[in-house]
Structures are given as structure tokens and as C-alpha cells.
Amino acid sequence: RGNTSSMEVQIDHVVALSNAWQTGAFKLSIKERTAFANDPMNLLAVKGRLNSQKGDGDAATWLPPLKSYRCDYVARQIAVKIKYKLWFTAPEKEAMVRILKSCPEKALPTS
């Protein structure tokens, strides 16, 4: 990262920190919150523009524009939320179910 690239490439928290807090991370210890924030399963290098669009959105409010990647992205969100015992809002769950119907064989990542 440098002066010209830092806005082009950013690190996305697949489960946004704010979303995590709202769905149970406030119950985690400081050590667990630090692990969550730095967990490679929850981190992706993405276009800065897309990270800005997503903000603290979940699957109900934002999905990757590349439709062929949505199953992977949603599966990753689910895996992260399960790992840290975070919950899903009803709209988020509905969006995830809708996406995963197109890829019923998709397994959740483990790391």
C-alpha cells in the first residue's frame, strides 16, 4: 500500500466489525474480539470502492457485484459468524438462504 494504492485496495472484514458488534461480538472477551478482527477467514483484499459501498452491511444490504462469487462470500460470512457465535438477523438469513439456493453443494470454509 502506498499513497496511490491505499484507496484502490483495502482490507474488507467479511463480517463487518459494526455488524459483528450488533450481532453478539459485544459478548466476546477482548482477546476473542481481537482474534475476530484479525482472523484471516474474515479478511479479504478488495477494491476500495466496493469496501466503501459495503460499509457495515450484511448479506441483506450488500453482496459482491460479481454474482459468481456470492456463494463463496455468503458461506464465508456464515462460517465466521458461527465460529464467533454471532447471530443472524431475519433479513440477513433470508438473503443468505436465497443466495445459497443457487449453490446447495457449497461447503463452509474452515480456515
Residue ranges and their predicted role:
Residues 1-111:
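Domain-level detector of nuclease and nuclease-like folds
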